[in-house]
């Protein structure tokens, strides 16, 4: 949970303890809300389900690089939400997003259990049935013209799913979508992801410049340093790239991710 919120574990522990005390003091009724109350609580529910999926997709710690049981449970919960609220755009958006990620599950690790980057995955093995289902859900959500962050993220994932390869992805449109996502949910992580698109739309130097102001917020985030390492290496700044890679490796808790970063350091 601390990793998901980019927070220190002691601070997150205190936040959780305070939340539990608040629930006990209020004698909170832990039951499924009435249908007319679902919309008011939806954002929090979707956020928790997405956190569960992300932990299953790439575990933050432990020996297992991925927790397929958690990812499957998150998809199942989102399908249940879809049954309860079949026309809700953000439920459609989250379900589409999770299915698009799930469509690549068979290609994310190689035969030795090593993490495979999106750029190197065998796209012929992606699950086209899940992609088609996700695209249908996303189309239904977008026709309602009630844009939300999960719909935008699903649209980004859909562009990756339809691209013939990594370099020929529609990075320009992805960059625009990250701008929209930043409007909806301002976050340094969104800006970091936008910098990935900038690398292919403008160039590595411009992308590196976009990451620099994010250092204060993301110094403890492994992917910040991993991205900067790749950008610095592309600019021939090898010593700085190695330093950034070492910082990313020190912050990574997932064994497969650590192995991938270590491989990059060995070159």
Where do the PLM segments sit?
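The alpha-helix within a helix-turn-helix
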Residues: 2
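Amphipathic helix-loop-helix modules that constitute alpha-helical solenoid scaffolds
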Residues: 7-179
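Solenoid-like repeat scaffolds
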Residues: 83-84, 143-144, 180-184, 213-219, ...
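Start-of-helix register in tetratricopeptide repeats
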Residues: 90, 149, 153, 189-190, ...
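TPR/TPR-like alpha-solenoid helical repeat scaffolds
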Residues: 98, 158-159, 195-198, 227, ...
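Alpha-helical repeat scaffolds
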Residues: 132, 137-138, 169-178, 204-217, ...
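TPR/TPR-like (Sel1-like) alpha-helical repeat modules
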Residues: 238-256
């Amino acid at each position: 949970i601390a990793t998901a919120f980019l927070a220190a574990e002691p601070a997150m522990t205190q936040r959780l303890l305070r939340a539990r005390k608040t629930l006990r003091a209020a004698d909170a009724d832990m039951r499924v809300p009435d249908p007319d109350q679902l919309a008011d609580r939806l954002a929090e529910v979707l956020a928790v389900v997405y956190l569960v999926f992300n932990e299953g997709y790439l575990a933050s710690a432990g020996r297992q690089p991925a927790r397929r049981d958690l990812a499957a449970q998150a998809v199942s919960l989102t399908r249940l939400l879809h049954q309860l609220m079949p026309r809700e755009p953000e439920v459609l958006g989250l379900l589409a997003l999770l299915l698009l990620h799930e469509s690549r599950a068979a290609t994310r690790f190689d035969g030795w259990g090593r993490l495979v980057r999106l750029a190197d995955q065998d796209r012929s093995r992606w699950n086209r049935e899940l992609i088609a289902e996700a695209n249908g859900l996303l189309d239904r959500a977008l026709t309602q013209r009630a844009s939300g962050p999960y719909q935008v993220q699903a649209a980004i994932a859909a562009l990756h799913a339809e691209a013939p390869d990594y370099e020929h992805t529609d990075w320009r449109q992805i960059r625009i979508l990250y701008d929209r996502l930043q409007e909806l949910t301002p976050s340094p992580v969104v800006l970091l992801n936008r910098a990935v698109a900038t690398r292919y739309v403008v160039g590595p130097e411009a992308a590196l410049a976009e990451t620099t102001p994010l250092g204060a917020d993301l110094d403890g985030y492994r992917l910040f340093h991993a991205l900067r390492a790749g950008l610095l290496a592309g600019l021939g700044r090898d010593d700085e790239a190695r330093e950034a890679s070492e910082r990313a490796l020190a912050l990574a808790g997932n064994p497969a991710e650590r192995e991938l970063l270590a491989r990059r350091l060995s070159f």
